[in-house]
Amino acid sequence: MKEIPITSFDNLQIGQAENAAAGTGCTVVLLGKDGAPAGLDVRGGGPASRESELLKPLAAAQVIHAIVLAGGSAFGLDAAGGVMRYLEERGIGFDVGVTKVPLVCQSDLFDLTVADAHTRPDAAMAYHACVNAESGNYRDGSYGAGTGATVGKLLGMDHCMKSGIGSYAVQVGPLQVGAVVAVNALGDIYDYETGRKAAGLLADDGRTFLDSELLALQSIEVKENKFVGNTTIGVVFTNARFDKSRLCKIAGMAQDGYARAIRPVHTTADGDSIYAVSLGDVAADQDVVGALGARVMAKAILRAVQAAEPAYGFPAVSSL
């Protein structure tokens, strides 16, 4: 098994755009002119999403044409309109005779409390991200959907750290599996291979880690003021051939990567979601791909916080 660039996959382009001053942005995943089968698994209690019904096994559509990861919470769902315009202009979408309708799914994270709550990803920003995908401008760190991402918010924004978007991909023989994830978790972030905490809840000194899980366990009383501005959203890619029902299972297995790297995870204050996409025709075991999906997702989460830069008054791993 060897690490490969996330750009190694055929039929995949990733572009990003952001408004750094406003603390928000979007990441667009384009899935080729013919689209690709995709599945979705949602574990968080507060998702903001678009066209997720398309990915259910009983839905008629067998492929989608793009996935958008964005900030802006539900306001940011406007961004998909820009992706649809970009794809329609290029004749990409589901043929309905008079035009082609691009099938674009989207999940958003909450970054409204970071800088400017009234500036969010919109159609223009997402269209720009599509144009950027042509030149492959994807970068890990505080870009795209990760622009306003933060982690460790059990005690609110005053004790959190800056996060971002991260990627990781591997190849085993002809099989490729990779992940891109925007990490905006309530919980803390860990290197699952060493058990070391990498980022998360900070004490009043702004440098010492506190343990979010231990703090949460100090009282079983219902917390009415739990900070709700969270959500980790990601995509697993593989060049193996699967239909969307199997991809839903692979996405579910990839959620184990969230559980390895984020503690606590899948809370009612998160909207944790993972897409899984098939980009090729390699014959591979579904469970092997799912297990690799969990591995690359956990590694991508770690990379998201390691690549982030301090911003908006929030420290990052690089500044501790």
Can you annotate each of these PLM segments?
Residues 1-74, 78-81, 89-320:
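A structural signal for small-residue-enriched, beta-sheet-centric alpha/beta enzyme cores
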Residues 84:
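Acidic/His-rich segments in extracytoplasmic proteins that coordinate ligands and/or metal ions
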